[in-house]
Amino acid sequence: MKTFVLLSALVLLAFQVQADPIHKTDEETNTEEQPGEEDQAVSISFGGQEGSALHEELSKKLICYCRIRGCKRRERVFGTCRNLFLTFVFCCS
């Protein structure tokens, strides 16, 4: 039983290392964007003064992580992440 618990903890730790952080794209970070099939270009256009303010707010870059337990204080849930048979919480700030 102790061996099973230890092996389970090691597997979860390995998944956490692979899943956290997934994607860092902020001016403050110096990591490169990872190219891949997940990259999608989205174009959003709004009209009027209210639309331009909304566009500025939406165009800010997010820092996202897959977390095991839940999001931290300043993060919000944006969905889920899957790695084999485990499901994580996708948190962005």
From Swiss-Prot:
Transmembrane intervals: none
InterPro entries named in the record: Alpha-defensin, Alpha-defensin_C, Alpha-defensin_N, Beta/alpha-defensin_C
Disulfide-bonded cysteines: 64-92, 66-81, 71-91
GO CC annotations, alphabetized: extracellular space
GO biological process: defense response to bacterium
Protein family membership: Belongs to the alpha-defensin family.
Keyword terms: Antibiotic, Antimicrobial, Defensin, Disulfide bond, Secreted, Signal
Entry keyword annotation includes Disulfide bond: yes
Described function: Probably contributes to the antimicrobial barrier function of the small bowel mucosa.
Name of the protein in question: Alpha-defensin 5
Signal peptide: 1-19
Principal location listed in the UniProt entry: secreted
Positions of the propeptide segment: 20-58
Record-linked PROSITE patterns: DEFENSIN (PS00269)
Species per Swiss-Prot/TrEMBL record: Mus musculus (Mouse)
Localization: Secreted
SMART domains: Defensin_propep, DEFSN
Keyword Signal attached: yes
